[in-house]
Amino acid sequence: MAQEIQKENNDHLVQSSDPEHPANLIPDLCRRFYNWGWVTGTGGGTSIRRDNHIFIAPSGVQKEMMKSDNIFVLEFPTPKYPPSDRKYIRKPLDLKPSACTPLFLAAFERGAGCCIHTHSQWAVLVTLLVEREKGPNAYFEISNIEQIKGIPRGKGKGMMGFYDTLRIPIIDNTAFEEDLTGSLEKAMEEYPDTYAVLVRRHGIYVWGDDVVKAKTQCESLDYLFQLAVEMHKLGLPWVKET
């Protein structure tokens, strides 16, 4: 009977000795993000698309304790709404799907291979500073910082340069994670070259063509956010005047 349940639940989709398999990468990434202070409690999330499968970290599991058998698997493409129409082909018993799922799907529909959601304190702080200094409709921007080179200009446009100005849109938070989807998609449309969207008083969504690009872009952005907070303390402008 146990073998039948395992077969019906497609557990083979998350069983692999390959460390680069999404079901192994997601728990590893979540542990790293926990250790870096990007996610606490059970907040945040990570998802990877491989061919026509999407692997997603679950809701309610401590990030540093996550295992490969905790991972959900969806067919891709799949409807974002209603949740009951999503094509799950593997569901861990006694776990809930991530509330980030429709936001991850929005990134995958635009060609992403990996999407990361963190609750980085530096990301939250820059959203508050931008709101106070520039108003609720402003975006985060910074220029003339070397680490900007770690961010793409846009799909097929290469990487940003030292003299470029990086702009990241900011959307307002909502009471429920899934309700952010519309605002996230609107920001993606208004900023078609962006690979990230900040969520005020909440965190950030970052995506990339693959796992390495999403992770390194997330690292570069977090560095820039921390630097921006420290620059603000010293009265230094984020965008250098020409």
Curated annotation (Swiss-Prot):
Binding-site residues for substrate, renumbered to this chain: C100
Q: Which GO terms describe its cellular component?
A: cytoplasm
Identify the Gene3D superfamilies for this entry.
Class II aldolase/adducin N-terminal domain
Protein EC: 4.2.1.109
Keyword annotations for this protein, in alphabetical order, are: Amino-acid biosynthesis, Cytoplasm, Lyase, Metal-binding, Methionine biosynthesis, Zinc
- Extract the InterPro entries matched here: Aldolase_II/adducin_N (IPR001303), Aldolase_II/adducin_N_sf (IPR036409), MethylthioRu-1-P_deHdtase_MtnB (IPR017714), Salvage_MtnB_euk (IPR027514)
Care to name a GO molecular-function term for this sequence? methylthioribulose 1-phosphate dehydratase activity
Catalysed reactions, as listed in the record: 5-(methylsulfanyl)-D-ribulose 1-phosphate = 5-methylsulfanyl-2,3-dioxopentyl phosphate + H2O
Q: How is the cofactor bound?
A: Binds 1 zinc ion per subunit.
Annotated region (Disordered), positions in chain: 1-20
Check the record and name the SMART domains matching this protein. Aldolase_II
- What does the UniProt entry say about where the protein is found? Cytoplasm
Q: According to its UniProt record, in which pathway does this protein act?
A: Amino-acid biosynthesis; L-methionine biosynthesis via salvage pathway; L-methionine from S-methyl-5-thio-alpha-D-ribose 1-phosphate: step 2/6
Q: Where is the active site?
A: E146 (proton donor/acceptor)
**Which residue intervals are annotated with compositional bias (Basic and acidic residues) in the record?**
1-11
For biological process, the GO terms are: L-methionine salvage from methylthioadenosine
- First-listed, main subcellular location of the protein, grouped into a coarse class: cytoplasm
| The protein's enzyme class | lyase
Asked whether the keyword Lyase is assigned, the reply is yes
| Required cofactor names | Zn(2+)
Summarize the protein's role: Catalyzes the dehydration of methylthioribulose-1-phosphate (MTRu-1-P) into 2,3-diketo-5-methylthiopentyl-1-phosphate (DK-MTP-1-P).
The record's section on NCBIfam families has:
salvage_mtnB
The entry's family comment says: Belongs to the aldolase class II family. MtnB subfamily.
Q: What is this protein called?
A: Methylthioribulose-1-phosphate dehydratase
Q: Which organism is it from?
A: Aspergillus niger (strain ATCC MYA-4892 / CBS 513.88 / FGSC A1513)
Encoding gene (name): mde1
